[in-house]
From Swiss-Prot:
Family: Belongs to the glycosyltransferase 43 family.
Residues of the signal peptide: none
InterPro entries linked: Glyco_trans_43, Nucleotide-diphossugar_trans
Role noted for this protein: Probable beta-1,4-xylosyltransferase involved in xylan biosynthesis in cell walls.
Protein name in UniProt: Probable beta-1,4-xylosyltransferase IRX9
Origin species: Oryza sativa subsp. japonica (Rice)
């Protein structure tokens, strides 16, 4: 009985499983048929359609990405030009007076919006090629700077101040050219006093810019002003058309104006009265204008910059600053012991 009952249970289980096997078989056949149909349709399609479709998809994705990049870049504000201020220290061998002049310049440069780079050139003794006091002072100013040292020779003290100033400016030009520092270059000294508007207007210069400079002689009680005569052009830009000198004798209470509306010679166009774009230092088209046999033909020379500045002035491409008639003085040079 027990065995019979066990056989009955087995029979019942086999009967309950038997109806499910055809369902599983039908599902497998349906799945295989669908896969076969998809493969058949894929095989009937033209082979060249697949690369074209893939290439079109890649092109669309690239186009969408580029549109996103263009839209983001168009909304990004334009980066202002870098202002490079070169300060030479040839006028004072006294460290205290040199520190006073550098501190005064640093206070003005701290008020200028970035980007700004301050290049300070200083002579150092040959046996000790370092200037720690000046380096510490520059770090405390909070102005982005580079301290350039020039080896001091035995005959440097007997050299004229103008020649020492030119040598230091050549060191700064060589540094700008070697490192491809792109921006507007302004030469200055320890005795220069800047109006903040001048430093802001420098970013509008594309090639050369000029402005009036007032030289104050405290001992002779006299002020001499040199600068460009400017006109407005049809394109609403201010260009130079002449050069003027003005001597004002504070003791006599009068003034004398002479040599107006004339082109300036190279010796008159002092580099402290104009700024230039540094890209001209590595522009080969400008090098070819002057023979290499000429003295100071190198693009790293201040004389080269002066000659190019006079050439731009004669072509009436120099920008006059700061207003339509270039009448505002925004740079004063104090003739003192500094």
């Amino acid at each position: 009985m027990a065995s019979a009952g066990g056989c009955k249970k087995k029979t019942g289980n086999s009967r309950s499983r038997s109806p499910r096997s055809p369902v599983v078989l039908r599902r497998a056949m349906l799945h295989s048929s669908l896969c076969f149909l998809v493969g058949l349709l894929a095989g009937l399609a033209a082979p060249s359609d697949w690369p074209a479709a893939a290439g079109a998809a890649v092109f669309l994705r690239t186009l969408r990405a580029s549109n996103v990049i263009f839209s983001r870049s168009s909304n990004r504000p334009q980066q202002p030009q870098l202002v490079v201020v070169v300060t030479t220290t040839e006028q004072s061998d006294d460290s205290e007076r040199r520190a006073a002049g550098l501190t005064r310049t640093a206070h003005a440069l701290r008020l200028v919006s970035p980007p700004l780079l301050w290049l300070v050139v200083e002579e150092a003794p040959a046996e000790k090629h370092a200037a720690p006091p000046t380096a510490r002072l520059l770090r405390r100013t909070g102005v982005v700077h580079r301290h350039l040292l020039m080896k001091q020779g035995d005959d440097d003290f007997s050299m004229q101040i103008s020649m020492r100033r030119e040598q230091q400016r050549n060191v700064a030009l060589r540094h700008i050219e070697d490192h491809r520092i792109a921006g507007v270059v302004l030469f200055g000294g320890l005795a220069d006093i800047y109006d903040l508007r001048l430093l802001h207007h420098l970013r509008d210069i594309r090639t050369f810019g000029a402005w009036p400079v007032a030289t104050v002689s405290a001992y002779e009680r006299k002020v001499m002003v040199q600068g460009p005569l400017c006109i407005n052009t049809s394109s609403s830009s201010v260009i130079t058309r002449g050069w003027f000198d003005m001597d004002m004798d504070m003791a006599a209470g009068g003034e004398r104006r002479a040599a107006a509306d004339r082109p300036p010679p190279e010796t008159l166009m002092e580099v402290g009265g104009f700024a230039f774009s540094s890209w001209m230092l590595w522009d080969p088209h400008r090098w070819d204008r002057f023979p290499l046999s000429d003295p100071d033909a190198s693009q790293e020379s201040v004389k080269f910059v002066q000659r190019v500045a006079v050439e731009e002035y004669n072509q009436s491409t120099t920008r006059g600053m700061p207003d339509s008639d270039c009448s505002q003085i925004m740079l004063w040079r104090i003739q003192t012991t500094l």
